[in-house]
Regions:
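Secreted/periplasmic carbohydrate-active enzymes, especially glycoside hydrolases
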Residues: 1-306, 312-314, 318-322, 343-346, ...
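Substrate-binding/catalytic cleft of secreted carbohydrate-active enzymes
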Residues: 172-174, 289-292, 299-541, 545-564, ...
């Protein structure tokens, strides 16, 4: 049977200056300089080295494999002086059989390179390309005859559930072997009861009454257990979870899950954290999911690369519909075609069994700085065909750059299309969002359209009673999103909408909002400690969990004698009290606005059913200068 030995402790890191530092994994060398602005974070080759004792194994009957779950971006692995493997691509799992190279004591050297080059994606994008070994490293001890480990980093087991017209479900299980043996397949329900079983490397089992994976309300999962037997003895086992669901997209009616309308409203997510970069823990993944669920989202765009398998597992468990993509982004590389193929193959093979995933993202904003348009289009057609060949059960999509017009041929290659539009932020005029959507839908009524990115920068420390585009205030960000939510309500045919972004994230080329190196469009701050007002706006729109929230709490000092106080809630009635006296009670939806006299300091209490929130404001003679963005002379305000 399999045994896993983690290699996470006691590494030596040889950095850019040649200095050696003791580190544990996960680790990145850009945790600080990749987040402080200047577009000068160090990109190059660093070395990780560790010593380990060979795990206990039978040389005649077992093998030892080395597994990396994420190393950015190009990797050369050397064991005891012998090159084991190389890998280009910073976000996927890869493995190597090291059985014949093992000694009693071993030296493992990993050369990691995130330098600028012309063939490995990403090379240009609005996020930091952290270098390092930032996910788990393990030794896998397996029988010499085992369920395959050497196939694109996947599990060796491919499960395809199909919901039939008679409401039964066919579960096809294909097992790839390295060696010989008898394959036995068991399907268990959530309580551990066996509901189907079969024998063979390619089998189909039928569920008479399948319990569906039904989004956030009921994300039911079966477990498929594949055993490899020899002489009546189980020598290897792989388990994978299975969700039975159907989905489709109607250009005129939106997304459907299991035959019913299921509007997709959610967020995009980058994986990095303040002071840590992409070297994060499972507990941090859990925290991200908890915050996304609190918001009431039902879909996540996992941008702009393959995320940790653990997070896809969480999406399965909590019913999040996922857009998964490769980092074919911003700039087409004429020498990068094979890398797009490799990364797409790894993405699909490694994530095929996740019921949460409904579409494969081919590219993002690829027209920003692409010169060879013919080669770029050919690359897209090739990737689109590859996705359909590898996985005919899912759809393909891409995210178009704002300046990529509706008539651009790249927007008509994939099954679905979405746009990254920031009308009302980078471009004046929130009303343009409605005009743009109406125009596209008029010209292409049979083309499914979504918004893959939309947002505005919002700093919790910046405030204004008269928020304007570009002021980076918490109030303008909220005002922007209020409009966008109403806009989407006017266009219910959209197949999906994804806020950019759930969390602030590092983009070292940026200098905006008074904090260089960051993109502040998140609904939650980079450290996950502060939920901006916009977070509560979406919670009011999407969540069933009763709450009430007074906005602009951090905007304490006011110069006006009467202030407008905004309250977000998903309750129908909100009452506002000032110093214990009821000012007013309103009935409405999502957004409630009150006028409050201000003379000195006032303590407010908002009440919605059993929910209560409080805030304090005070009148001052002069504006608090800390609320206003100090303009800089930086020429690198944006990343492009």
């Amino acid at each position: 049977m399999r045994k896993i030995v983690r290699l996470m402790k006691n590494w030596q890191f040889i950095g850019p200056e040649g200095n050696t530092t003791a580190v544990d994994l996960p680790h990145t060398w850009n945790a600080i300089d990749g987040q402080d602005g200047g577009n000068d974070y160090w990109r190059g080759t660093c070395v990780y080295r560790t010593r380990f004792a060979a795990p206990a194994f039978e040389e005649v009957s077992q093998q030892v494999w080395l597994q990396f779950e994420g190393v950015n971006a190009s990797t050369k692995v050397i064991l005891n002086g012998t090159e084991v493997c190389v890998h280009d691509g910073g976000y996927s799992t890869f493995r190597a059989n090291i059985t014949t190279l093992l000694r009693e004591e071993n030296i493992l050297t990993v050369e990691v390179d995130n330098s600028v080059n012309d063939h490995v994606y990403p090379q240009k994008a609005d996020f930091t390309f952290y270098g390092g070994i930032y996910r788990d490293v393990s030794l896998l001890v397996v029988h010499k005859d085992h369920i395959a480990l050497g196939h694109y980093g996947d599990t060796g087991v491919k499960v395809t559930p199909t919901l039939c017209k008679d409401h039964t479900a066919d579960i096809r299980v294909e097992t790839r072997l390295e060696g010989e043996g008898t394959v036995r397949v068991t399907l268990n329900d959530a309580e551990g009861n066996t509901v189907a079983a079969a024998e063979g490397k390619d089998v189909t089992m039928t569920l008479a009454h399948p319990h569906l994976w039904d989004g956030v309300k009921d994300p039911y999962l079966y477990t498929c257990v594949v055993e490899l037997e020899q002489g009546g003895e189980v020598v290897d086992t792989v388990s994978t979870r299975v969700g039975v669901r159907s989905f489709r997209v109607d250009p005129k009616k939106g997304f459907f899950l299991n035959g019913r309308s299921y509007p997709l409203h959610g967020v995009s997510r980058h994986q990095d954290r303040k002071g840590l970069g992409n070297a994060i823990s499972r507990e941090m993944h859990d925290e991200d999911m908890t915050l996304i669920r609190e918001l009431g989202a039902n879909t996540i765009r996992l941008a702009h690369y393959q995320h940790d398998q653990y997070f896809y597992d969480l999406c399965d468990e909590y019913g999040m519909v996922v857009w998964a993509e490769i980092p074919y982004i911003s700039e087409h590389l004429p020498n990068g075609r094979q890398n797009t193929i490799d990364q797409m193959e790894e993405l699909i093979y490694q994530n095929y069994n996740h019921p949460c995933i409904v579409c494969w993202g081919v590219s993002n904003e690829i027209t920003i700085s692409t010169k060879d348009k013919a080669d770029m289009l050919d690359n897209h057609h090739m990737l689109n065909d590859l996705c359909h060949k590898m996985d005919p059960t899912r759809l393909t999509t891409l995210a178009c750059y704002a300046m990529c017009g509706p008539f651009n041929p790249v927007a008509h290659i994939t099954d679905l299309v979405s746009w990254n539009l920031y009308l009302g932020w980078y471009v004046p005029g929130l009303f343009l969002n409605d005009l743009w959507l109406n125009f596209f839908h008029l010209v292409y009524p049979n083309r499914a359209l979504g918004f893959s990115e939309y947002g505005a920068e919002g700093m919790p420390n910046l405030h204004s009673e008269h928020p304007r585009r570009g002021d980076h205030t918490e109030e303008y960000q909220a005002k922007y999103h209020e409009y966008m939510l109403r806009c989407f309500d006017r266009h219910p045919w959209m197949w999906s909408t994804h806020v950019w972004n759930m969390f602030d994230f590092a983009a070292d080329a940026r200098d905006q909002g008074g904090e260089p190196g960051m993109n502040h469009k998140g609904l939650v701050t980079f450290d996950r400690k502060t939920k901006k007002d916009s977070f509560y706006l979406y919670k009011a729109w999407w969540s069933d969990e009763a709450f009430v929230h007074i906005c602009s709490k951090r905007f304490t000092d006011r110069t006006a004698s009467e202030i407008e106080v905004k309250v977000y809630s998903n309750q129908k009635t909100v009452a506002l009290f000032a110093d214990g006296q009821k000012i007013a009670e309103q009935t409405g939806e999502h957004v409630f606005t009150f006028k409050v006299p201000l003379n000195g300091e006032v303590k407010l209490q908002a009440v919605a059913g059993e929910c209560i929130d409080t805030a304090s404001f005070r009148k001052v003679d002069t504006p608090n200068p800390g609320y206003k963005l100090v303009k800089t002379k930086s020429k690198s305000a944006n990343w492009v």
